[in-house]
Amino acid sequence: EVAQNEPALRAEKSRYAVTFREYLTDDCRLVLANLRDAVASGAQVANYLSVDGLLGENQAEGVTAQCALTGRSIQVKAAVVVNATGPWVDATRQLEADVEPRLVLSRGIHVAVRRTDLPVNNLVTMTGSDGRPVFALPRGPVTYLGTTDTRHLEPATHHPSVEQIDVDFLLTTVEDHFDISLTPKQVTGAWAGLRPLISKPEQTTSELSRKDEVWVGPRGVVTVAGGKLTGYLQMADDVLESVDTQLSAQQSLNSSAVFSGTTSTSKTLPGGDIASDLSLAAQTLAADHDLALPIAERLVRRYGSETEAVITLGKEPVAPGAHLLSGEIVWAVQVDGALFLDDVLVRRTGSMWFDPEVGVLIEPVAEQLAGLLGWTSEQTSEQISLLERQQETDLTFI
């Protein structure tokens, strides 16, 4: 049965199989959906705004922050401040007091190759030479591989480098498990991220627990660190319990007033209320709008029950033969808050990572964004150059 489902696997390496669903997630769109839901519930959300200080003396009473777009500084008053800054948790804690670091940063990379070069039909789990698990996952026209686990000794950054040694580790692992040999030149997309792990003496990054921890600092800042994306709802509940304790101690509000009616486990996020299964929804969408089935499947998986609204904004491809539709660009700006070219092609649509033909998308998408956001020709050219340089940096190992 394994051989029938995954004929490219080495039979001697894969005698058994299980179904594993944890990785059926688009992390960027999951974050966006949570932000949109928060706004709908009354939250104020600000992007490109970095915190650089705390208000108050003995107790944190808010933050000072600077807008990365205008340079303007603002103050935000708050009864409780939460530090949920991921790899920047320790740097943010330094705003509260001179404290010892509690994090170890682990760098993980992914690489994507054409699905024709590594044909898999399901999530395939492999074991690397050091015993670490490596996954191969099909996504549209590509199969992507990940991840690695390497201690990151430099300060946290939004764009960690994709190192040659990590790429070689992933490609070698594939060769050990498939009758396929991949080279770096076959990689069409690559990216790296940082895991903020709670430090434990004498443990390597792969040995460190992924469990989250919540604690309160000397000025009352609630900090959360560690954890995994799949456990974010429970992490949020843990943070809110700590916030509730802080508020109750201040005699500002009681718990029933603060969190009445909020149940994270039963909440449906925007786009999540699909009545039928995804395959049927995609088939219906393709028939109703004369779309190729692969495009319809991608749209339904990306936008869920909001797919019809996206198509209404434009169902023509952004370039001849492209799978990305013009309505997706409008949606990215008007609904998902995109401001720059990389916002759209990296975080909102994932095209930079998961579309081997992304090169033909860059200029037409930039031109469409220029019309939506009022860019000058110079600003448009700058956005194109920035994205192309980032792509070149990510693929330096080729």
Can you say where each PLM-predicted feature lies in the sequence?
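A structural signal for short hydrophobic beta-strand segments in well-ordered beta-sheet cores
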Residues: V51-L54, F135-A136, V214
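Residues that act as N-cap/strand-start positions at coil-to-secondary-structure junctions
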Residues: V39, Y48, T70, L105, ...
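Flavin-dependent oxidoreductases
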Residues: G56-Q59, C67-L137
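Helical element adjacent to the flavin cofactor pocket in flavoenzyme catalytic cores
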Residues: V18-V80, A236
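C-terminal accessory subdomains/tails of enzymes that are appended
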Residues: E1-E12, T19-C28, A40-S41, T85-P87, ...
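Glycine-centered loop/turn positions within well-structured domains
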Residues: Y16, D52, E61, D90, ...
